[in-house]
């Protein structure tokens, strides 16, 4: 079921004066970019290519992850400075959920080209509006529990960006996680809230992750970025000149009658590469990247097990997503379940524990919670079998 339209009164979007609640001096307001792509294959069959996870209410409220992301940005920016980059298949759903955004702030990518093309396009479009802008890029499908702490952390990143650094927001690790990439940082400097990023690290093996956490020098890479658009675009031109030239040409035509033709001609030629690989790793080697460590209850909602860890439970540790669904669920002598009833059928479970049960109109998933990461292999197999209608 799609969340109700997101009706935010403009009064909820704060002014510069209100930002004093978060920081000690007046700061410029961000341009916020929300890349909204990917299908969330570990959340199949709830999340599908045609209705990915960011459009679902996985927040414990009626708001979708995308809506929660926009609401979280209210102390940092305004609707006219908030841009969403999404695929053509999702434009209508994004517009329905984000009625407060101007139509022209939903940027459409004709096909997925990974994160660098999407973020670079937004940066280039913003640069045509304000060449001196500071922009932040924040994923559409993450959960953050402590919004005030997150806002303060982002504002510290803005200060670094104003000095010409390519900033990230790193997450202080709470466990030796093997499903995330890491940022290797330098030592803290007294009086400076950020640390230099020495290297971006791939997802590690368990023993390596444990060493990272023990070191105190490694943070989770949450793919949150803050920078001046001129600095980012200059770094993009240095490392990825073809991609830079492409998005610059698209941005030059943006808002003109030639926009669609230029976008359609150039977009398929852009390299398909993440912004980490394309820009940030090389910039870190050159000493141009810094990070602000954050501890604000971040979660990437990567699979159903994770969802079960962050949403409210009953006395037996069971999580039911969408408790308003009818006829709903009937759980007896069962514990530590994640149940997602989405078909209109009754879901009944008796005498089981540590399972994921997802019931949709055309597919049912049942698996142990500790196999949640492997759900994506089912999606891969369905694709191999040519059963794209299920994915």
Predicted regions and their residues:
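Extreme N-terminal basic, low-complexity initiation segments
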Residues: 1-8
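Conserved N-terminal catalytic core of the sugar/cofactor nucleotidyltransferase
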Residues: 7, 14, 19-35, 41-49, ...
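Left-handed beta-helix
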Residues: 12, 18-24, 28-29, 229-391
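Conserved beta-strand scaffold positions in the cores of enzyme catalytic domains, especially
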Residues: 55, 106, 166-168, 288-291
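Residue-level signal for inorganic ion chemistry
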Residues: 66, 122, 141, 183, ...
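A short acidic, often aromatic-flanked loop/helix-cap motif at beta-alpha or helix-coil junctions
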Residues: 112-117, 175-177, 205-208, 298-299
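Conserved core of the sugar-phosphate nucleotidyltransferase
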Residues: 146-267, 288, 368-369
């Amino acid at each position: 079921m799609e969340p109700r339209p997101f009706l935010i009164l403009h009064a909820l979007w704060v002014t510069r004066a209100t930002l004093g609640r978060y920081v000690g001096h007046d700061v410029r307001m961000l341009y916020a970019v929300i890349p909204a792509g990917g299908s969330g294959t570990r959340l199949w069959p709830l999340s599908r290519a045609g209705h990915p996870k960011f459009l679902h209410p996985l927040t414990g409220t009626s708001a979708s992850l995308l809506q929660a992301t926009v609401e979280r940005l209210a102390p940092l920016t305004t609707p006219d400075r908030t841009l969403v980059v999404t695929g053509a298949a999702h434009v209508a759903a994004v517009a329905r959920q984000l009625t407060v955004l101007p139509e022209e702030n939903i940027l459409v990518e004709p096909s997925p080209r990974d994160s660098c093309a999407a973020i670079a396009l937004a940066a280039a479009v913003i640069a045509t509006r304000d060449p001196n802008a500071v922009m932040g890029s924040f994923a559409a499908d993450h959960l953050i529990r402590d919004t005030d702490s997150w806002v303060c952390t982002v504002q510290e990143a803005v200060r670094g960006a104003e000095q010409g650094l390519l900033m990230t927001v790193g997450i202080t690790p709470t466990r030796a996680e093997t499903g995330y990439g890491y940022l290797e940082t330098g030592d803290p400097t007294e009086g400076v809230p950020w640390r230099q990023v020495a290297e971006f690290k791939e997802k590690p093996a368990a023993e390596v992750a444990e060493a990272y956490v023990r070191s105190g020098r490694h943070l989770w890479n949450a793919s949150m970025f803050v920078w001046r658009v001129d600095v980012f675009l200059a770094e993009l031109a240095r490392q990825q000149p073809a991609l830079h030239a492409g998005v610059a040409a698209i941005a030059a035509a943006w808002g003109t009658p030639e926009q669609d033709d230029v976008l359609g001609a150039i977009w398929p030629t852009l390299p398909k590469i993440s912004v980490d690989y394309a820009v940030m790793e090389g910039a870190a080697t050159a000493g141009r990247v810094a990070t602000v460590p954050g501890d604000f209850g971040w979660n990437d909602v990567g699979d159903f097990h994770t969802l079960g860890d962050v949403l409210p439970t009953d006395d037996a540790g069971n999580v039911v997503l969408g408790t308003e669904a009818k006829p709903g669920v009937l759980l007896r002598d069962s514990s530590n379940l994640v149940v997602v009833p989405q078909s209109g059928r009754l879901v009944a479970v008796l005498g089981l524990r540590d399972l994921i049960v997802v019931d949709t109109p055309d597919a049912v998933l049942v698996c142990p919670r500790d196999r949640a990461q492997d759900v994506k292999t089912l999606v891969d197999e369905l694709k191999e079998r040519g059963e794209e209608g299920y994915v």
